[in-house]
Amino acid sequence: MKSIIKIAALARVLLFVCVCFSFMQSLHADDGQLAEAYPPNVVAENFKLSDITGEMHELEDFRGKHVIINFWAMSCNICKSEMTTLQSAYELLDNENLAVISIHAGDPSDGVKSVLELNGIEYPVLFDVDLQLGEWGIPILPTSFIVSPKGNIRYRTVGTRVWNSPFMIDFMQGILDSDEPQAANPDPI
């Protein structure tokens, strides 16, 4: 009887390890791909959403700049971690032709302000309370889009990214330095 209990306990531990390993693999499944290139001339749909103070913002306000739009939710812990790397990348890139916007899926009253303050997030965080931006093709959170100064979607990232990693900084700098589409899978050296 004791051996059956030990075998059952070992099976639970092995199952737990397998689930954890599988989860971690899914987070890093596309590390080799920094971003998915979009077909040319796919126009980003305009939106009008409020920030935490109630001020309204629309995508059109950022026309003329490259814009990273990051979709996230409070219930997504990896989303909150990604936001800090996005803030750091924004500071490292320090480019007047770059804007970052985060769009929270849901109500602003669920502790968002404290998370933003705690993590030093300075870029605009908007609220999609009615979840009206579903047409953006967001399979999971976080998902981000890189929009050109002309308003076309150039790239999409699905899942978490370490935006302040050397590879992502180089990738973004290449986008900022050129109006030509950049290869979405540069060879990491």
Whereabouts are the PLM-identified features?
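Structural microenvironment flanking redox-active thiols in thiol-disulfide oxidoreductases
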Residues: 80-119, 130-135
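Bacterial N-terminal signal peptides
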Residues: 11-22
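Alpha/beta-hydrolase fold active-site loops
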Residues: 66-67, 142
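Thiol/disulfide oxidoreductase modules built on the thioredoxin-like
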Residues: 114-121, 127-174
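Conserved redox-active cysteine motifs that mediate thiol-disulfide chemistry
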Residues: 63, 71-88
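N-terminal "domain-start" segment that seeds a small globular fold
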Residues: 28-59
